[in-house]
Amino acid sequence: MQQAQEPRPALTIKEIPAPDFPGAIPLDSVDPEPEQWMAMGRDRGVRNVVSAALIPFLPDPAKAASTAVIVAPGGGFRMLAIDNEGFKAAQWLADRGIAAFVLKYRLHSVPRDTDAFMAAMMSTPPGIPATALQDARAALRLVRSRAADWKIDPAKVGLLGFSAGAMVALELALGEDNSARPDFMASIYGPLSARPVPADAPPTFAVLAADDPFFAAGGFDLIARYREASRPVEFHFYEQGGHAFGMRKQGSTSDLWIDQFHAWVKSRGLLD
């Protein structure tokens, strides 16, 4: 008998002061008004991001591989779930020798009032802001340009995105602008509907749950496009997980996604 998942508690949002990240690297954007940080249950989020930054999580040099992963949180391009889909994943990777960098990319403007913001989050999500793509490309170029400083192989820089962040990752990996392709890519509960897969598409790891309320109904024809293009792809379709689970454990097999991603990276020789 299938075990039902426990219902998630209602989410409450409380404004909190912006934390200080001494090692954050600005990505050449201007901040005319302070971004807004929020406590969302046990995790933090941030909205109205207009000044992009890259926040490093570097491994212990004694166990560091030469691989880097840029982590792009989701949030519907109206906020970033920067703890559950950013810092926690980056720290997990750094603990296993992978240099990780959380990308705080620019978003669409949303109401500064909390109640109005919550109402706006219930509306149809906007499309990918051009600034988010600019920030992701800038992040890839920056990590490669400073690869020697961080003891990273500039040919082993991947991009891992959650939900909206996965849409950014997919666009960089598959879009017509190939000026800053990642060397490998992970789409964590991003859309997997069909789109062209170019001949230079990077190896891709993809995750989706059958009960994802946003993207499961769209299917995963993109995986077939990878196969038709003879490009490497690994796809995990979980029975349960929903959407936006990130690093949160739910007692389902989707809890294992990051272990499986790590195993995939290792199997491709990226941790040698």
Please give the residue ranges for each predicted region.
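C-terminal catalytic histidine-bearing segment of alpha/beta-hydrolase fold enzymes
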Residues: R227-D272
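Alpha/beta-hydrolase active-site loop
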Residues: D115-A148, W257-Q260
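N-terminal cap/lid segment of alpha/beta-hydrolase-fold proteins
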Residues: Q5-K63
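Cap/lid segment of the alpha/beta-hydrolase catalytic domain
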Residues: G76-F77, A81-I82, K104-T131, M247-K249
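Short beta-strand element of the alpha/beta-hydrolase
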Residues: A65-G74
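Primarily recognizes the serine-hydrolase "nucleophile elbow" in alpha/beta-hydrolase
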Residues: T131-A201
